[in-house]
Amino acid sequence: MRKGVLKDPEIAELFFKEDPEELFIDLHEIGHGSFGAVYFATNAHTNEVVAIKKMSYSGKQTHEKWQDILKEVRFLQQLKHPNTIEYKGCYLKEHTAWLVMEYCLGSASDLLEVHKKPLQEVEIAAITHGALQGLAYLHFHSLIHRDIKAGNILLTEPGQVKLADFGSASMASPANSFVGTPYWMAPEVILAMDEGQYDGKVDIWSLGITCIELAERKPPLFNMNAMSALYHIAQNDSPTLQSREWTDSFRRFVDYCLHKIPQERPAAAELLRHDFIRRERPPRVLIDLIQRTKDAVRELDNLQYRKMKKILFQETRNGPLNESQEEEEDSEQGSNLNREVDSLGSIHSIPSVSVSTGSRSSSVNSMQEVMDEGSPELVMMQEDEGTVNSSSSMVHKKDHVFVRDEAGHGDPRPEPRPTQSVQSRALHYRNRERFATIKSASLVTRQIHEHEQENELREQMSGYKRMRRQHQKQLIALENKLKAEMDEHRLKLQKEVETHANNSSIELEKLAKKQVATIEKEAKVAAADEKKFQQQILAQQKKDLTTFLESQKKQYKICKEKIKEEMNEDHSTPKKEKQERISKHKENLQHTQAEEEAHLLTQQRLYYDRNCRCFKRKIMTKRHEVEQQNIREELNKKRTQKEMEHAMLIRHDESTRELEYRQLHTLQKLRMDLIRLQHQTELENQLEYNKRRERELHRKHVMELRQQPKNLKAMEMQIKKQFQDTCKVQTKQYKALKNHQLEVTPKNEHKAILKTLKEEQTRKLAILAEQYEQSINEMMASQALRLDEAQEAECQALRLQLQQEMELLNAYQSKIKMQTEAQHERELQKLEQRVSLRRAHLEQKIEEELAALQKERSERIKTLLERQERETETFDMESLRMGFGNLVTLDFPKEDYR
């Protein structure tokens, strides 16, 4: 989606549709930062006073700027707390987002700027209390501010403390981005990319630094280069309060906030119960502080206004002031200004505007314009008011006009209209009571000027932060890529394992089906063989029976014939008796044959049953052998499959191990490359900073050398004036002495006395002239020597400072490199332990599976043999009951398949 084109309904809901240029009027610039400017404005429909932060998302890094805007809007929409800035809405206009928020008087940093001295401890406690309540709310919802400092803690008219500027905030905790303002950054933020993540405890560190800022007018290390400050924070001990005037409770609170180890740092909710926060303080402490600050701002602006008015009137009457008049006027006004400010208890402070682009340090600050309607001499300024305020878009383009003053300073004397140039300078201090503020116009102008002047340093820090974020994105992208590669690798291995398992299952199913088919086939063959065997026995027995019967018939005939012959030979026996004896003999023979036949049939039946039983036992034994062969084949197949599976798992483990080592090497190589690039950039930035400082010092020295003749001329004129005064004194003394001598000496000696006095005067003037020349030469030489010595001392001090900063950078980089190498070593050891443990688990699993398989083999074979043995015993017992003897001799020998 093109930036700013609201095609996505979710994004479109973040912005209002009205035209902000028509909705908001009377815009005045009240702050400036890297993102753009902050304006005071009025809602044309409701007359509500608001603050507007304009953020452009065109130019370089458009996508990044647009994403920052979306993130800040989403973040602000979530906030509903008395100690966070109230969000009014966001509008889009010509590649610029108008972020509208409630208007506040100014920031805690402005208090230091106006009063030019540290705040009182009760005032710091009150401001810290409000900030902690806001932080507790953010941290409860897993939000991190990441840019807590005095410039981002705002104050309202009723004395309410508000957290503002959520451009650096994170909607996720923990986070690991390099964001914030250098001097307030927690160590874990600086080392976030190198050592891991951080949470809301970073805001607690920044709050501790802010307490030092409010107590000492500037954060620790503020006199140091911002980059060097980062290196210092990352590797040195936590800062502490320097002055001994603070209470032990305050000291403990600051030390508690600034624990180096985040886990030892307290949470915001815990700090709210600290003695420093809970102790009693006046309920109006912040309201009184704000009122004193507003009075001081009004007085400062009125002093500036009177200075401009005096210059304006002086120019109107006498023309432009000469140089000496201007210097004298500046000196006078400066002393007046100092007297007025000191009467309010104020001293100067270091500006809190951050040099960091990412910090978005310009808070929603504010200022006040007051208008003296009773000053007739300002009528011509009021006539130009329409020109100045006719267009809000012109206000911040024309010299950053900030105007204010107070009634009661008017001069009723009519004056002629001043020149246009002086009038434009006076426009800065016109009197119109437009809005209340605790920030003076000169402070706003100075901050805007500093923002323009520090662009190079700000761009350097912005580039450094951008590089750190880019490095982090590269690492995250690589980690995601490697994770996807590992997931794909594991999925591939898992599929291979599943395929092997499926194939093994299919093979076992095929084997089982094959074995079932073989058993069925063997059963059919056995049934057929048994039937054939039975038929063979029956056929043989039938044949034997037929032969036996035929033999009996022959024997019967032979016996019958033999008996007949015997009877025929015996003539003594009656015929009837013979017939009876023959019949009886025939019956006996038939009976004997019948018994023999029955015996034969019995023997045949017994033989048939015994042989059938024996054949069945042989079939059973053969079936047992087939079952043993089948189970042996199945178990061998399972063992082969399991061995193949184990070989595959070992191969998978080795390939995974190789991939893990390769990925770790790739990740560590990229990390080291990025660290080297980061260190190279840091070194280049430091060298560039060194050159810039040397150039600035050189320019300063050149300006001093150029200014020296003018200074020497002024000193020479001063010595000359002293010489002239001395000459005048001597001339007066000469005249007085001459008159006295002429009065006390005769007239004829007057000529000689005059000559003597003239010679004495000439001699003394010559000595005086020589002293004058000598004084000039000594002054010239001493000033030149003093300038050379001062410049040389400055050069030496700068070289020493830059050398210390370079040593600090080298120490920081060495520490980071050592920490990274140690981290890599830990990662390698952790990987080795994980790989070793995984291999041990795999080998243990293989052993357990092989043992389980062997146990299954033994149990199944044992179960089979026991079943077969029981079946054989049952068969033999039944055979015994059937009257058959031991059939084992006819059985096949058993084999031990175990």
From Swiss-Prot:
Q: Which residues carry this modification: Phosphothreonine?
A: 357
Keywords, alphabetical? Acetylation, ATP-binding, Cell membrane, Coiled coil, Cytoplasm, DNA damage, DNA repair, Kinase, Lipid droplet, Membrane, Nucleotide-binding, Phosphoprotein, Serine/threonine-protein kinase, Transferase
This entry's Gene Ontology molecular function terms read: ATP binding; protein serine kinase activity; protein serine/threonine kinase activity; transferase activity
Per UniProt, the enzyme's principal EC class comes to: transferase
Instruction: Give the region (Disordered) as residue ranges.
Output: 316-372, 405-424, 565-596
Residue stretches making up the Protein kinase domain: 24-277
> Which residue windows are coiled coil?
452-502, 548-649, 753-871
- Tissue expression as described in the entry: Ubiquitously expressed, with a higher expression in the retina.
The positions flagged as active site in the entry are 147
Q: Where is the composition biased (Basic and acidic residues)?
A: 405-416
Q: What is this protein called?
A: Serine/threonine-protein kinase TAO3
Organism of derivation: Rattus norvegicus
Q: Report which gene this protein is encoded by.
A: Taok3
